[in-house]
Amino acid sequence: MEIKEMVTSEMPRERLLSHGAKSLSNTELLAILINTGRKGFLSIDISNELLKSASNLNELKKSSINDLIQVKGIGLQKAITLKAAFELGERMGRRAENNRIKITQPSDVADYMIPTMKDLTQEHFVILLLNSKNVVIKESCVFKGTLNSSIVHPREIFSIAVRENANAIIAVHNHPSGDVTPSQEDIITTMRLKESGLILGIDLLDHIIIGDNRFTSLVEAGYFDEND
């Protein structure tokens, strides 16, 4: 029995096409790499056995060709395919790590975000998620349109930060007019996020407003001072 005998909607390839790769389990992703099963086993069964052979994915990627072919259903060609996929993933991970930006001052944020935000014709509200070393681990656009403090919910923003295990966040949004003067709504939104961050233990480090090759840091402008 091979994977083609499964109900079409349940096949890993079909699920990937319908719902995206992120919706698939580790077992299903490996089954796609394994491609075909062997007599009496679906590729999904072989994938399960493969995962059982190592304590976790990190250990599995360290497996040698000889280790992999010890798993029933994994021949030399499948082992080579898996090893190549593991190495490619490792290289991509190293490259992503090397490309991450460390934030040490507001101008670092501006240099990072101005190229993508300065020409936008609509306001975009983005959060940068940082680890404990102030390295950007992810950016997420949470809102598009005219900024309104009643629309930008701290709950939505910090749920993303919690999900990504962020240590701190920086808010960034653009002014299509090019004027980087903070509006009253900008200030209110900043204060709400700052207060929520203090409660949750995820600091809002700054709010940067991007204009036409210019920026304003609300920290540098004094809005984060304890007396404000």
Curated annotation (Swiss-Prot):
Disulfide bonds: none annotated. GO terms for biological process: proteolysis. Residues 102-224 form the MPN domain. It holds the Pfam family RadC. Keywords: Hydrolase, Metal-binding, Metalloprotease, Protease, Zinc. One of its GO terms (molecular function) is metallopeptidase activity. Zn(2+) binds at residues 173, 175, 186. InterPro entries: MPN, RadC_JAB, RuvA_2-like, UPF0758, UPF0758_CS, UPF0758_N. A motif (JAMM motif) lies at residues 173-186. Belongs to the UPF0758 family. NCBIfam families: PRK00024.1, radc. This is UPF0758 protein SAB1521c. It comes from Staphylococcus aureus (strain bovine RF122 / ET3-1). The lineage of its organism: Bacteria, Bacillati, Bacillota, Bacilli, Bacillales.
